[in-house]
Amino acid sequence: MLQLNLQFFASKKGVGSTKNGRDSISKRLGAKRADGQTVSAGSILYRQRGTKIHPGENVGRGGDDTLFAKVDGVVRYERLGRDKKQVSVYPVA
């Protein structure tokens, strides 16, 4: 009579899937011009989500809360009360 002796050795059988392995690209937010730097009108000063920094003198706020210079001048970051900050642009005389 024929007798079969089947032996299965360790091997990789099935491969599962993972839910990791992806990341979003950075949005490059933050200060684009430093305090004391000279800027021209229309220059982006600060990119942000929400109003982390508020617009001050001669500074406008875009639809995505980006702060930009309205006039040529020098950038100044200032405190606005106890807990707020603002950025202003003062024209050079």
From Swiss-Prot:
One of its GO terms (cellular component) is cytosolic large ribosomal subunit. The N-terminus is cleaved by ribosomal processing cysteine protease Prp. Pfam families: Ribosomal_L27. The keyword Ribonucleoprotein applies. Residues 1-9 form a propeptide. One of its GO terms (biological process) is translation. It comes from the Bacteria. Keywords: Ribonucleoprotein, Ribosomal protein. The keyword Ribosomal protein applies. Residues 14-33 are annotated as: Disordered. GO terms for molecular function: structural constituent of ribosome. Belongs to the bacterial ribosomal protein bL27 family. HAMAP family: Ribosomal_bL27. NCBIfam families: L27. This is Large ribosomal subunit protein bL27. It comes from Exiguobacterium sp. (strain ATCC BAA-1283 / AT1b). The gene is rpmA.
